[in-house]
A protein has these predicted regions:
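Conserved Class I SAM-dependent methyltransferase catalytic core
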Residues: 14-16, 20, 24, 137-194, ...
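SAM-dependent transferase fold signal centered on methyltransferase-like domains
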Residues: 30, 76, 80-87, 127, ...
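Mobile active-site "lid"/loop adjacent to the S-adenosyl-L-methionine
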Residues: 113-142
Length: 220
């Protein structure tokens, strides 16, 4: 069922969501609030789904805003969401991140990727959620290759991933000279460990990492 919601922390920005697909959650919100984008930037959102992170990026009025996804139904909703909020200079492209290359290198890549290695039985036969949450068809290595292929030198990637797999991320990012410059761990108020971590990396940058104060999520 399609419903009309608003972007977390931005009640003036509305977004259509489909209960059968991946909907906005705290991961979306914390990554959206983590972004820094400039007006001259070309921004690429890999796996845009219904365009929530594109809407966050649009608040900075970038020169060009591109979202790609392999889910045509999600792209249709993303188009409605861009039009609903009068977003300018946007493009939505049906494409597979395993091979996608934009017609120019970009300044910023945004990515809230599928980060589970194996599908959950709870998803049943929901192909939309399987694509959004599990990396069967888009491995972590392929994700990093897609970022590297499209990001200019000194360009920035904003990324969110499972904390338990941080070593994998660091190894793969370093192999492509995507140097992690900032991290912020996200905690549930009721847990003693972090489930996800926000990452800012810069292609070809010098070493130097800042770990910011964590985000504590209270779901009440």
């Amino acid at each position: 069922m399609i419903r009309l919601d608003h972007l977390p922390k931005h009640e003036d920005i509305q977004i259509y969501q489909d209960d059968e697909m991946f909907c906005i959650n705290t991961d979306t919100m914390v990554l959206g609030e983590f972004l820094e984008v400039y007006k001259q930037d070309v921004v690429l959102d890999i796996g845009t789904n219904t365009g929530a992170l594109m809407l966050y990026a649009s608040l900075f009025n970038p020169r060009r805003l591109v979202g790609i996804d392999i889910n045509k139904k999600a792209l249709e909703l993303a188009k409605k969401n861009m039009e609903l909020n009068n977003v300018q200079n946007y493009e939505l492209i049906y494409a597979d991140g395993n091979t996608f290359r934009l017609d120019e290198e970009v300044d910023v890549v945004i990515f809230n990727p599928p980060y589970f290695k194996t599908p959950s039985k709870d998803l049943g036969n929901n192909e939309y959620l399987a694509l959004a949450k599990h990396e069967d068809n888009f491995s972590l290595e392929s994700m990093v290759n897609c970022i590297n292929r499209n990001l200019r030198n000194n360009g920035t990637v904003y990324f969110l991933f499972q904390t338990s797999r941080l070593n994998e991320v660091i190894k793969l990012f370093n192999s492509k000279k995507l140097i992690i410059k900032k991290m912020k761990f996200v905690y549930d108020v009721n847990k003693d460990f972090s489930n996800v971590v926000l990452i800012k990396a810069v292609k070809g940058a010098k070493e130097g990492l800042v770990v910011e104060k964590p985000i504590i999520i209270d779901r009440k």
